Amino acid sequence: MTNAVQTHTPAARAKPKKAIQGEKLRGYDKVARIPIKIIPTVEAKKKPDWIRVKLSSPAEVARIKSTLREQKLYTVCEEAACPNLPQCFADGTATFMIMGDICTRRCPFCDVGHGRPNELDKDEPRHTAETIQGLGLKYAVITSVDRDDLKDGGAMHFVEVLNESRALSPNCLIEILVPDFRGRMDIALDLLTETAPDVFNHNIETVPRLYKAFRPGSDYQHSLDLLKIYKERRPDIATKCGFMVGLGETEEEIYKLLDDLKAHNVDMITVGQYLQPSKDHAPVDRYVHPDEFQRYMDYGKKIGFFNIWAGPMVRSSYFADRQYYGEDCPAPIRSKKALAAEGKLGC
């Protein structure tokens, strides 16, 4: 296993930019000040054949992007450079990212820009609701950047989006993918307990050993507690959690992570391959084989999760409606040549 980070000072580079309100810092400027420094990637690992996405309709992708720009909205699909964007947009689905496009955290696996965010857009809840209605969505996913600058972490803004969206699209199910509300858990959970989504999702991202390197400013147990406490308050609402593999974790650590999530009453799980957004982000430690993802799904079913999706291209909101309704995880797209080489052609 290779090290994804270093604890000594790297070769000298230009001094990183300082955060200016409303300006996004990306790449080196974003990660330069995290505790464990990233070694810029010189040569990325070659992607295996199973890192593939389905071809999509350019016209539908363009239509959704046009609608989003008209309403001045962001999607995590675009801001985090999700590889599934063409497929999801062509399917008429998108994960809306509220509270702006500037995050107050500096996670080195994420492509969302860091900095000092602007004030909340008071029209964003209405614009989000109008877009959900205009696209005719039956299932919508709402996520956000971290907003450590807000007294409630942005929980009330989630509530306003929920209320506006349900007023215009009462039959649309809404999943929220929330930040950890660090230092604001009680007030955030009070608000989201009273005005609840259909699915409460929070990503734990990685195993506890890797938190200092990959989730600076976050706490593993805090994320577990957020999920457990919400389920205790609203046992009628499905809880969900996602994490990545390929950052340097071991298979045994993943099984322990799944045990922890089950012990904290999480209902649904997503597990996906980490893909490096740029040379200045954390490098890929390894590409996890589809057979290993299958072992995680088998284990998750064995210990009693309602549904677990694990695969190279799985993300927390990947076909979220299908997972909610209990469908099985789609198989990864692979070439016949690769399957034949593994003796699996026709299986």
UniProtKB/Swiss-Prot annotation:
Q: In which pathway does it act?
A: Protein modification; protein lipoylation via endogenous pathway; protein N(6)-(lipoyl)lysine from octanoyl-[acyl-carrier-protein]: step 2/2
The record places domain Radical SAM core at 89-306
The cofactor note reads: Binds 2 [4Fe-4S] clusters per subunit. One cluster is coordinated with 3 cysteines and an exchangeable S-adenosyl-L-methionine.
Gene Ontology cellular component list: cytoplasm
Q: Which reaction does it catalyse?
A: [[Fe-S] cluster scaffold protein carrying a second [4Fe-4S](2+) cluster] + N(6)-octanoyl-L-lysyl-[protein] + 2 oxidized [2Fe-2S]-[ferredoxin] + 2 S-adenosyl-L-methionine + 4 H(+) = [[Fe-S] cluster scaffold protein] + N(6)-[(R)-dihydrolipoyl]-L-lysyl-[protein] + 4 Fe(3+) + 2 hydrogen sulfide + 2 5'-deoxyadenosine + 2 L-methionine + 2 reduced [2Fe-2S]-[ferredoxin]
EC number(s) per UniProt? 2.8.1.8
Binding residues for [4Fe-4S] cluster 2, per the UniProt record? 103, 107, 110
Alphabetized Gene3D superfamilies for the sequence: Aldolase class I
InterPro entries documented for this protein: Aldolase_TIM, Elp3/MiaA/NifB-like_rSAM, LIAS_N, Lipoyl_synth, rSAM
Annotated compartments: Cytoplasm
Swiss-Prot/TrEMBL cofactor(s) = [4Fe-4S] cluster
Pfam families in the record: LIAS_N (PF16881), Radical_SAM (PF04055)
* Sites where the protein binds [4Fe-4S] cluster 1: 77, 82, 88, 317
Coiled-coil positions: none
Keywords attached to this entry: 4Fe-4S, Cytoplasm, Iron, Iron-sulfur, Metal-binding, S-adenosyl-L-methionine, Transferase
- Main location group: cytoplasm
Q: Which GO terms describe its molecular function?
A: 4 iron, 4 sulfur cluster binding; lipoate synthase activity; metal ion binding
User: Which HAMAP family did the record assign?
Assistant: Lipoyl_synth (MF_00206)
Give the protein family.
Belongs to the radical SAM superfamily. Lipoyl synthase family.
Protein name, please?
A: Lipoyl synthase
What does the record give as the organism's lineage?
Answer: Bacteria, Pseudomonadati, Pseudomonadota, Gammaproteobacteria, Moraxellales
